[in-house]
Amino acid sequence: MRASGIILHITSLPSPHGVGTLGREAREFADFLRRAGQKYWQILPLGPTGYGDSPYQTDSAFAGNPYLIDLEQLITDGLLTREEVDAVSFGSDPAQTDYGALYAGRFDLLRRACERGWDKERENVDAFYRENESWLRSYALYTAAKRHFGMRPWIEWEDEDLRLRRSEEVLRRYEELLAEDIRFCIFTQYLFFRQWHAL
């Protein structure tokens, strides 16, 4: 049986927040494809990107890209305010993505959402963590450690015990030291997958 579809990364959808997200625009596009008789939407990888922001150069095969979290939904959920979101510049040219502005603005807003939502969503976040602990524990520690070591590649991190040996004692020490950033990573993954599954 023959079928047709389209290839379009979610970031290519229109958005006032720098890149397309898992929000209303994605739902409307999926509805449009259905009405147009299309059976497939190839979305390309959705993992968190690093330097260069290519969806094919990701830090994890399992994690979702925080850029794709819909800020409008976070306003609806009471985790952000309209004023906070509107105060952030995601770049001056709507035809091009300014990844520097996107990174700075988006992560500041997501940190605010985490501060407000961690206790409110704690039971759901804990359940999400338990279901995904096989990859999420390591990924959250990695992202927090990368930030701790100035966003340098892991092979340049000063602590050889963390880079090479990764004993449970060393991991626990860093989990305690970097608890706030680890919590932020876990919360953003929770938000991403909640929105992804809703789509």
Language model segments and positions:
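Acidic/aromatic-lined carbohydrate-recognition and catalytic surfaces
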Residues: 1-199
